[in-house]
Amino acid sequence: IRPAGESLKGFGGMANPIKLKDLYSRVASLLGKAIGRKLSTVECCLLIDEAAVTIVAGNIRRSAGMRQFASDDKEAASAKENLWSQDENGNWRIDPEKDALRMANHTRVYHTKPTYQTVLDAVTKQFHSGEGAIQFAPEAIARSNADILKDDELRKEFIEIYSEQGKDEARNWINSSYGPFSEEELDHRMSRYGLNPCGEILGNDFHCNLAEVHLNQIDPENFEEQKKAFKAAALSVACLLNHEFEVERYRKSREYDPIVGVSFTGLFDFCVHAFG
């Protein structure tokens, strides 16, 4: 076990094993409760999220997660409800059994077009709790195949085929219209409704593929400094296009869809500095 503060090679950060002991007991408890049956989707998430809690201990490393569930997974849809409660003295406390779920966003994925009421309910739930997001897979896949579905009309046609005739028919349409593709590449193209860890970029089998500019560290009046910051971020993230991934599926994903991005954080502070 690495001692606290030791530098980690690869993607960086420092070790902090302070939560490691808790991780093993939590995982043992989760698995013990499921003896004789399959884990539920939420229990699977908790296994990953408990590891994330361990990683961020000491606030010197980061973890981000996106959990995508089937559209009809009712347990997942309500997993974060009643996360907080008040005792008789009015003090708020978090449910210790659910605490780790805060480490990831929960999104239900629709492969057919959701009704207006479904969308309204999802947005309303997000307004009240910050959770309850839904995703329309055909649109995500269409956006992620922009190299072949080059305009809105083609994307609309794909979405219509996928929604009304199913994923297999949409797959055949892509292959006959723009292929032939290998089965492996076709599988990858049709699975591009996955997300990078913070959800900025659609795709499949991603590590974090984003560089971030901290706007709150930049002078709002210094345009040259801003250009240099974003240029540095672009050069930094471009390194991932040459990173030697150990896992084959990550290497294949980069081969089929070599996408990286630049984003920013601290916009609110940036605007305060700029406008008061």
Which residue stretches match the model-derived regions?
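Flexible, glycine/charged-enriched surface loops at secondary-structure junctions
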Residues: 34-46, 55-67, 240-255
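Generic structural signal for well-ordered, non-membrane alpha-helical segments
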Residues: 16-20, 24, 40, 44, ...
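Function-dense linear segments that define catalytic or interfacial modules
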Residues: 1-9, 125-275
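Conserved, charged catalytic cores of large soluble enzymes
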Residues: 18, 22-31, 50-177, 264-276
